[in-house]
Each structure stands twice: as C-alpha cells, then as structure tokens.
Design a protein with these regions (language model features):
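N-terminal targeting leaders characterized by basic, low-complexity, disordered sequences
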Residues: 1-18
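ER-lumen resident redox/N-glycosylation machinery signature
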Residues: 38, 113, 117-118, 168-181
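Extracytoplasmic/periplasmic, Sec-exported soluble proteins
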Residues: 76, 105-109, 152
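Local sequence-structure signature of Cys/Sec-based thiol-disulfide redox active-site neighborhoods
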Residues: 85-126
Length: 197
C-alpha cells in the first residue's frame, strides 16, 4: 500500500509539474501573441500615417500648380500684375481674364471644369490667367486689382472678367460664400450668346 501511495504521490507530482509547465508555456504563448498583435497594430498605424502623409504631399503639390497652365489649355499667363496693361494692349477684341489663386481644392476644381469650356469654345488665345496667390496676403489686394483693371466689380476671387472692345462687359462671380465653378462661366457665355473663336 505504501508503495502504491508513493507511486500515486509521484504521479500526482509529475502531473502537477506537467500542468505548471503547460501553464507557463500557455502564458509565454499568450505574451508572444500579445506582442505580435501589438507589432501588427503598430505597423498598421505607421503604414496608415505614411500613406496619409504621402497623399497629403501629393495633393498639396497638385493644388500648388495651375491645372489650366500645366495642361497646356491656356498659355496666356499674366505673371505680374504690373504687366497687365501692357499685355492687354495686344489682346483680341473679345477676351476673358481668370483672376485666381493656387493651393486650394476648390480653385483647382474650377480650373479642371474650365478646361472643357476653353477647349469647346477654342478660347486658348483669348483667355488670360492671373494667379494672385502671393498678393492675397496684402490688406488692399482687392483695391489693387480693381485699380489695375479700372473697375470696382472685383469683390472676391476667383473671378472671370469678360471684355469686349476694351470694355468690361461682365464678371463671373458668386455672391454666396462658394467659389465660382465652370457652370457659372458657361451661364455667362450663354447669356451673351458667345459663339467662340
């Protein structure tokens, strides 16, 4: 009986030892799984941040340029406001001037929408582009624009000025807080029954 009892005690000790070993192994495996999950989450977060930053840089780069100029749709760019009068002395009898700024999704979308209209009406030789982004930090930039174009109708930008025979006929502008869009320009062309070049 004593031997059986000793054997039973030994077997129980072995079983207890095996259970403890299994518990330790399970605990190690559990820690390992937690570490692996943590690393996966960290990689996903860092990967997401990287993708976000890359997309943001690409967007900023895209919006920092004029779509109409870069695509070759327009080639009549007024690079300096002080050159406006000199440049416009050589303008055709009927022309348009887009006064806008870059670095903004809404103005970029305006330009992409205008491309189709410029192409449809063959306006590339009668459509001027003026980017005033650098000017917009000045307190009096609207006054300066109005003075340059000899008008008082420039209240906001972007705006499109429509000239015929040297006179400002109309402006394409919005009176709400939204940026003008291509359909606003199309509406003006329709009102004046503009046929194109």
């Amino acid at each position: 009986k004593e031997r059986k009892t000793e054997e039973v005690i030994k077997e129980e000790k072995i079983k207890t030892s095996e259970i403890k070993t299994n518990e330790v192994n399970d605990e190690k495996a559990s820690r390992k799984n937690i570490i692996i999950i943590g690393i996966i989450i960290l990689v996903l977060v860092l990967g997401g941040l990287y993708i976000y930053k890359v997309n943001k840089v690409k967007q900023e780069e895209l919006y920092s340029k004029s779509y109409l100029i870069d695509s070759g749709t327009l080639n009549l760019e007024i690079k300096n406001i002080d050159e406006v009068n000199q440049i416009l002395t050589e303008a055709p009898s009927e022309y348009f001037i887009l006064i806008t700024y870059t670095g903004n999704k809404a103005t970029y979308n305006l330009e992409t929408g205008l491309k189709e209209i410029v192409d449809k009406y063959k306006l590339s030789d009668s459509f001027y582009y003026l980017n005033i982004k650098d000017m917009m930090n000045e307190d009096n930039y609207l006054t300066r624009l109005n003075s340059t174009f000899n008008t008082d109708k420039i209240k906001t930008v972007p705006i499109i000025l429509y000239y015929k025979d040297g006179k400002l006929i109309d402006t394409v502008t919005r009176y709400d807080k939204n940026v003008i869009n291509a359909s606003d320009f199309q509406r003006t062309l329709d009102i004046y029954e503009y046929q194109g070049q």
